[in-house]
Structure formats: C-alpha cells, structure tokens
Amino acid sequence: MPERNPVAPPALPWLAIAGPTASGKTGAALAIARHWRQRGGPPVEIISVDSALVYRGMDIGTAKPSAAERAEVPHHLIDLIEPTAAYSAAEFAADAARLIGEIHGRGALPLLVGGTMLYFKVWLDGIDPLPTADAGVRAQIDQRARELGWPALHAELARVDPITAARLAPADAQRIQRALEVWQISGQPLSSLHTGRSASSAWAHSGLMLSLEPTSRAWLHQRIGERFEAMLAAGLIDEVEHLRARGDLHPDLPSMRCVGYRQTWEMLDGLWPSAELLERCSAATRQLAKRQLTWLRGMPRRQVLACDEPGLVERVLSRADAWQADAR
C-alpha cells in the first residue's frame, strides 16, 4: 500500500513557526497563545512538527514541552508512538491535515511549531506515493547492518540504486535503510519513484510560516551549548539509561538516532569518555541546525524574523496579529 499523499481542498488557514533547534520556537508559540487569550482572540492548538517529539519516554533530550505547557495550550503529535516504532513524513502530512480540520471545527486556530523541515516540505509540497514501511523488512536490514556495517549496505544500494546511493553518505543509516526497504518491497529503486511530479498540497498557500533564523551563527551555537548543559543537568544520561534498560531498543532505531540520544548511547557503550558528551551532543546539534537552515532557505514563502535580535516576541506577535486579522 502506498504512503498517503494528503491533499485537503479547500485548505483552511494555518500559522506556523519554524526554525533551527534552540531558536525560540516554543516560547514564541506559547506567547501567541497567551496573547490571543488575553485579548479575547481565538484559542490556539499547537501541532508539533518535530520527529523526535512523537516518541514516548523521550522527554529530556527532545526538550518536550512540559506538562504545565501542554495543559495550558493543547498540543498534538506528541507522545504518539513507542521508540521501537517509526513515523514517516507522509504520516505527519496526513495527521496534520486531519488535525487542522478538527481544530477549526472546535473554533480554534492551528499553530504548527517545529524544526523537522522534511515534515513541513512534504505537507506543503506533496510527496510521491511510496511503499509503506514494513517492520519485518526493516528488521532484516538492521540485522545485516549490525553484521556487515552500514558502509557495506551503502555499497549494496549503489548496485541496485546508484542515483540514491550517490547522494547518501555511507553512514546515513536511516536513508540507506529506507532506500533498501523500498527496493526490497517494490523491486524498484527509490530514485525511480521520486518523479518530482507529485501534486502540490492544497495547504501551500493558505497560511503563514514565520521562520526564526539567527543573523549570528555564534549566538545559535551558544544557545545550543546552554541547551545541552541544561539537558544533562535535568538527567539526560539517566533517561537514556532507562531506555537502554527496556531491552527492546538498539542504536540503529530512528528514535535512538535522535541527536543527544545517539551520542549518550555511544558514551554508555564506552566508545568515548563522559567528559566529551556535552561537546559531542552540541557539535551534532550544530550540524543539525545547519541542515535545518539549508532547508529553510529553500522555502521561499516563509517570512524570516531574526531570532537573535531584541524584541523577537513582539515581532512575532505583530506578524501573527496581522495574519489573524486577514484570516478572519
């Protein structure tokens, strides 16, 4: 069965806050909800656009909104699945489309918040139909990767799908796994299924995306370091130890490849000393932020707000108020 390619005409209004890790998205979103509530405006419900927040039991390392924040403002697409499972961009797009309709049906406004840019892209631009993920096939691929290593599977992919293999690093486990899975299920290379002719989503022109982007890379890097210091103080290592103790997780799962969890797992495996954990997590997050900003630059409809300049919340509220007035 192909993955869902949701198109929802007529598309309803939506507001989104995107940006790299540590840019202040959560604070800005909560500020909008509180601002409109104080002014007698429409209630807000937040739709998480974050591939790490879907996992249960992964709270500290994902900077999951607190129980108090989630009680104050309804949040969706958080704690959806166990960390043994997977959640695709196509599933997100379908769930977001459904939730936007339900939120409008309750007389509220949907606010999409997050930094998983692939989710935004698939939801806004559509996606080619692809085979649904198969847990059995993935387990077989993971087992072979443990025996042979991902570079060997990358070489195998190069034989059956050289176009996809050429754009993937030999250690890009998640994407190599998906490409081999598609090949095994369909008998067709993933590159032949990415036609670029998928129908554009009806959502693309019905809302406003505010993108919080720094003018100073050093500012963002400092925020990232401070964020991980706080996570370590809050018990990130204990959280990963608890996940390891379950006995049903391994480091090749998408959940355990999340930034922070992967590095902590490797440290607990003795691959390098605990004194290096903060810098390794911070470095991986800096690379993630760089990729997020690259994705954002390819989204011409976004409105950029400098997140490292004074008055960010006020500027966000001004743009949100103007959008809300036009969306009535």
Swiss-Prot record:
The keyword Transferase applies. It catalyses: adenosine(37) in tRNA + dimethylallyl diphosphate = N(6)-dimethylallyladenosine(37) in tRNA + diphosphate. Substrate binds at residues 21-26. This is tRNA dimethylallyltransferase. Keywords: ATP-binding, Magnesium, Nucleotide-binding, Transferase, tRNA processing. It comes from Leptothrix cholodnii (strain ATCC 51168 / LMG 8142 / SP-6) (Leptothrix discophora (strain SP-6)). GO terms for molecular function: ATP binding; tRNA dimethylallyltransferase activity. GO terms for biological process: tRNA modification. ATP binds at residues 19-26. Catalyzes the transfer of a dimethylallyl group onto the adenine at position 37 in tRNAs that read codons beginning with uridine, leading to the formation of N6-(dimethylallyl)adenosine (i(6)A). Its cofactor is Mg(2+). InterPro entries: Dimethylallyltransferase, IPT, P-loop_NTPase. It holds the Pfam family IPPT. The lineage of its organism: Bacteria, Pseudomonadati, Pseudomonadota, Betaproteobacteria, Burkholderiales. The keyword Transferase applies. It comes from the Bacteria. Its EC number is 2.5.1.75. Belongs to the IPP transferase family.
